[in-house]
UniProtKB/Swiss-Prot annotation:
Protein name: Protein gfi-3
Functional description taken from the UniProt entry: Probable component of the anaphase promoting complex/cyclosome (APC/C), a cell cycle-regulated E3 ubiquitin ligase that controls progression through mitosis and the G1 phase of the cell cycle. The APC/C complex acts by mediating ubiquitination and subsequent degradation of target proteins. Required for the metaphase to anaphase transition in meiosis.
Record PROSITE patterns: TPR
Keywords, sorted A to Z: Cell cycle, Cell division, Coiled coil, Developmental protein, Meiosis, Mitosis, Repeat, TPR repeat, Ubl conjugation pathway
Source taxonomy: Eukaryota, Metazoa, Ecdysozoa, Nematoda, Chromadorea
A GO biological-process term: anaphase-promoting complex-dependent catabolic process
Gene Ontology, cellular component aspect: anaphase-promoting complex
Segment forming the signal sequence: none
Tissues of expression: Expressed in gut cells and mature sperm stored in the spermatheca.
Origin species: Caenorhabditis elegans
Assembly and binders: The APC/C complex is probably composed of at least 12 subunits: apc-2, apc-10, apc-11, cdc-26, emb-1, emb-27, emb-30, mat-1, mat-2, mat-3, such-1 and gfi-3.
InterPro entries the record matches: Apc5, TPR-like_helical_dom_sf, TPR_rpt
Annotated TPR repeat ranges: 526-559, 637-670
Length: 800
């Protein structure tokens, strides 16, 4: 029976990623081949031959000593890193300064250059194998097994080694040779012509390296320097944008890098960062997608497989995990929270499939950032608005990392972590951010928590080693900014001032000449400066607050970092509104309210309602407040307090009492330091206006300690005025409270309130008052008249 023919075995080859991506790894842009670099290469080769010899022949002169090699390498490093092209005349001067001609180094170098200039030799960039092996080949005139070979090698020992395979000089030479070997015959002809012209020219060389017919600046003329420039630009944008290029200029160079150096895929990442700073979200997302698409293949580490298949690239799944996180971050920054959540869900699923702990933790942190804060510049709780998108509470707080061995069960992937130490530092950083997010959630829910020892874990208690990525400083800065913000949130202005000043004082420049030692000008430090201004304004020092704001405007302009600048805009609007309100300048107040509209509806509407009430439109102001849909606990309390104050000013005391009761019921369920005294002070003021003076003094006594410790400048002023008026109307001595009131506004921050204090003093010294004094009364009336001329209008302290 005839056997059936065997079925053919068809081997289906996988996609050739090298061809699809344009042979990126074989088309790297090496060191540009310029006359100065060719001359440096020739000089290096002559120095090696002088030290080692040529082929099997030993050197005529004795080898260089370690001290001599150190001096030689200093000069070679200077020539290799030169940014400008030297003329042949200048190069000759350098060689004469660098080398005494006892070994005829200069003579041999000049002879080689003169041959090229005379057309007697072409440029040949090659080096003997002995440069890499540091071993002489056997003398062909002697038998191969002759013991003389071994004896001569032992006699020379290690002194013939010229350089290390890990040295900068070695890597520079490999880059130059890599670029030269890819040159076409026409390019080789151009190199020879340029070199001949360089040798014969008596003036400074005008030669510029070109790549594909386009001149490239030195910092991006090869893949290595382009990648280094991209990394430095990303670093400076995140730390201090003043030391980076202008964004439009950086975008121009970034696109040149993308076009001319396809292996530098980080150029797309830099473009995405720049587009975020330029507020172009669509272009940023497009660049981020390009970055991860191009990074979906990497260099094959299995050289046996690469040699068999002749393919350098292999696919990687890392972008499937990390790409959604960065894209979601861009969506969050520009307010697209729904898309951000969808992307983060995808990243979490990919991380769970591949058991990547770092990716899983990063996605969790970003998910909580979206759900808790979004991209708001203020500590406001918006959790209820996004509750339908949240499943179960993800656990971002885990066991604290105290040692690198605590990090287990992690499969390292991607370029973000190249060692276990970096894994440990990055996960510790994510854990610290997780703790801070949970603390922010607690603060937004109306709780004051003073345990901060785990907040800045990476920077304080977590051993991060040298902290080369400055993760510890960044986390510590976020923790310090959160501390000072929470203190401002609870009326602890003096403590917040100390915390903010310490934070800013530690952010100093240690070396004026080194940009890497420059102070940080990032968002956490902007928040620290803003909190310093808030703390100054909270105690009535508006001049110092305005000076701080002006300094912040110079340090954080919008064209450098709009994310930091928005804190400055909010701070300036809040403080200037309060300053203009105290001076009865309602027109200026209205312009400041517009600056808050884009950042916080709550802050904007509260101030709009206050202006409407001051203009006598109480009903319209109450409607504005009732139209607010706020879930932030402190925001709801403030709405009730503001509504109650408006009812108090319009003498609708029953409605005011109801609003204050609602505010107090909410405030008593929080642990905020200042909110209960603030509510009770307003209740006391309402009772005073209603004629219930005994009950008013009882409430004032209850909230006295809280107001003195946590009350702002205006809060204390209203408290003292309420106490003074109640004491006077009850026939008691109010001078202690009037003295405190007048001392509080002695610098003229609130002229209308000063008039109110003077009117109380006048009522006290009136003929029918408790302490009649005609002389004192006339003095007070004279002061009142002068103030009225400078600041007309009444004091609307009942609305505050």
């Amino acid at each position: 029976m005839q056997k059936a023919a065997p079925r053919p075995i068809i081997k289906r080859s996988y996609l050739n990623l090298d061809a699809i991506f344009g042979h990126v790894f074989s088309n790297l842009t090496g060191e540009p081949v310029t006359p100065t670099k060719i001359a440096t290469f020739y000089l290096l080769r002559i120095l090696f031959q002088t030290h080692f010899g040529f082929r099997h022949k030993r050197a005529y002169y004795k080898p260089f000593s370690p001290a001599e090699k150190e001096r030689i390498f200093h000069w070679l490093y200077a020539l290799m890193t030169s940014v400008v092209e030297l003329s042949y005349k200048d190069f000759r001067i350098v060689t004469r300064l660098a080398f005494d001609d006892g070994r005829e180094v200069c003579k041999n170098f000049y002879a080689a250059m003169e041959k090229i200039g005379a057309g007697m030799a072409d440029v040949t960039l090659n080096v003997e194998d002995e440069f890499y092996t540091n071993k002489h080949p056997k003398d062909p005139k002697l038998p191969a097994n002759d013991t003389v070979h071994e004896a001569m090698d032992l006699a020379r020992g290690d002194i013939i080694q010229f350089s290390s395979n890990h040295s900068f000089m070695y890597r520079w030479m490999k880059r130059l040779l890599a670029q030269y070997t890819k040159s076409t015959p026409s390019e080789v002809f151009q190199i020879n012509a340029a070199m001949k012209s360089w040798v014969l020219s008596a003036v400074e060389s005008k030669y510029h390296p070109e790549f594909k017919g386009e001149y490239l600046p030195h910092f991006i003329d090869c893949s290595v320097r382009a990648r280094d420039w991209v990394a430095k630009s990303i670093y400076f944008i995140q730390k201090n944008p003043r030391f980076a290029f202008q964004y439009n200029e950086m975008l121009h160079y970034t696109r040149i890098v993308q076009k001319r150096h396809p292996d530098v895929v980080e150029g797309f990442l830099l473009e995405a960062i720049v587009q975020v700073q330029l507020k172009d979200s669509s272009s940023a997302i497009k660049a981020m997608k390009s970055f991860f698409e191009l990074s979906m293949f990497e260099l094959n580490e299995n050289m046996v497989h690469a040699a068999k298949t002749h393919r350098l690239a292999v696919p990687t799944q890392t972008p499937l995990m990390y790409a959604p996180i960065l894209q979601a971050r861009i969506c969050r920054i520009f307010g697209d929270y729904q898309m951000a959540r969808l992307l983060l869900h995808e990243s979490l699923q990919q991380a769970q499939l591949r058991n990547d702990e770092i990716c899983h933790q990063m996605a969790n942190i970003e998910m909580h950032t979206v759900d808790i804060l979004g991209c708001r510049a203020l500590l406001e709780d918006n959790n209820e608005k996004t509750a339908k998108h949240i499943e179960n509470e993800r656990r971002v707080q885990r066991k604290a990392l105290l040692h690198i061995d605590d990090l287990h069960g992690h499969t390292r992937s991607g370029p973000c972590c190249l060692s276990s130490e970096e894994d440990f530092e990055l996960v510790a950083e994510m854990d610290s951010y997780g703790k801070m997010l949970m603390l922010m959630k607690i603060i937004a829910e109306g709780n004051y928590k003073l345990i901060y020892d785990r907040v800045a874990e990476t920077g304080i208690t977590c051993p991060v080693g040298n902290d080369l990525g400055e993760r510890g400083r960044k986390v510590a800065a976020y923790g310090a900014a959160l501390i000072s913000s929470n203190m401002i949130h609870n009326g602890m202005y003096h403590q917040a001032k100390c915390a903010a000043e310490n934070m800013l004082a530690n952010n100093c420049r240690t070396d004026e000449t080194d940009p890497f030692q420059a102070p940080f000008q990032a968002e956490p430090w902007a928040i620290g400066a803003v909190n310093l201004s808030y703390s100054q304004a909270g105690v009535g020092n508006y001049d110092a607050a305005l000076r701080t704001i002006e300094e912040m405007r110079q340090n954080y302009p919008e064209e450098l970092s709009w994310q930091s600048n928005r804190h400055v805009v909010i701070c300036a609007a809040v403080i200037n509104f309060e300053r203009f309100l105290l001076k009865n300048d309602y027109k200026a107040c209205a312009s400041e309210v517009l600056n808050l509209a884009a950042h916080s509806e709550l802050e904007c509407k509260l101030r709009q309602a206050l202006l409407l009430a001051a203009a006598g439109k109480e009903r319209a102001s109450v409607e504005v407040l009732e139209g607010l849909n706020v879930v932030d606990i402190r925001g709801r309390i403030r709405i009730h307090m503001q509504t109650g104050c408006i009812y108090t000013a319009s003498q609708e005391f029953r409605k005011a009492a109801r609003e204050f009761a609602d505010a107090l019921s909410l405030a008593e369920n929080t642990t905020l330091k200042d909110i209960v005294p603030m509510v009770k002070r307003r209740q006391a003021t309402m009772l005073m206006c209603h004629g219930q003076y005994v009950e008013c003094l009882k409430l004032l006594k209850e909230c006295n300690e809280g107001i003195e410790q946590f009350g702002s400048f205006t809060e204390k002023a209203c408290y003292y005025m309420t106490a003074a008026r109640c004491h006077r109307l009850l026939g008691k001595d109010p001078r202690m409270w009037l003295k405190k009131s007048r001392a509080l506004v002695r610098n003229g921050q609130w002229p209308a309130f000063t008039k109110l204090v003077l009117s109380e003093i006048a009522a006290l010294h009136d003929v029918k008052g408790l302490m009649p004094d005609e002389n004192r009364l006339s003095q007070i009336c004279e002061q009142f008249g002068k103030l009225t001329a400078d600041c007309p209008g009444r004091c609307e302290w009942l609305l505050i």
